[in-house]
C-alpha cells in the first residue's frame, strides 16, 4: 500500500527545529521521495529553497522488520540534492535508520549520519512522521488511535534516466512529488 508522510519534527542535538514543510511519499513497490522545502527561506536559501530533496528506488533501500512495530531501513539515495549541489559537510552513502510506530499513529525515525566523512564522528538525528491519507486533498491524519488504515489510493512512478536528466516522480493518491536534475 502506498504511503504519504508529513514530518512533524526534526531534531539534531538536544533541540528540535522544524523549518520545513516536508512530505515523503512511498509507492506500492517501495520507490520513495522526500521534498523538504523551507517554510521561510532567507539569505542563501532563497536561491534553492529546500533543506534537502532525495529519492530512491526500491533497489536503493533495504528494509528489515524487527517486530513489535520496529523496522530498520538502510537508504542509499539514487537522487540527492546535497550531492548534486556539492553541499559541503553532508553525508554520502548509506543512511541507517530505525522506524518505530507509536500508539498515537505517528512514526519515529532515528539514525545517524556522517557529514564529515565515514571515518569521523557521527551526528544523530530524530524525525517524527505523521501518516496522512493520500486519497484526500487535505492533510488528513491517518490512524490517530492506531487503527488499521486502508485506502484505495494507488501509486504511479515515473523514473527518468537519459543523457540529459535523472528524475523521479511519484503519484500517491491525490498527491504528487518529484524532481529532476540535469546531468553534468
Curated annotation (Swiss-Prot):
Keyword Magnesium listed: no
Record InterPro entries: Hri1 (IPR031818), Hri1_N (IPR038744), Hri1_N_sf (IPR043047)
CDD domains: HRI1_N_like
Keyword Lyase among record annotations: no
Residue ranges the record marks as coiled coil: none
Alphabetized Gene3D superfamilies for the sequence: Protein HRI1, C-terminal domain, Protein HRI1, N-terminal domain
One Pfam family here: HRI1
Domain of life: Eukaryota
Keyword line: Cytoplasm, Nucleus, Phosphoprotein
Gene Ontology cellular component list: cytoplasm; nucleus
Compartments in which it is found: Cytoplasm; Nucleus
Annotated positions of the Phosphoserine modification: 143
Subunit annotation: Interacts with HRR25. May interact with SEC72.
Family: Belongs to the HRI1 family.
Protein name: Protein HRI1
Organism whose genome encodes this protein: Saccharomyces cerevisiae (strain VIN 13)
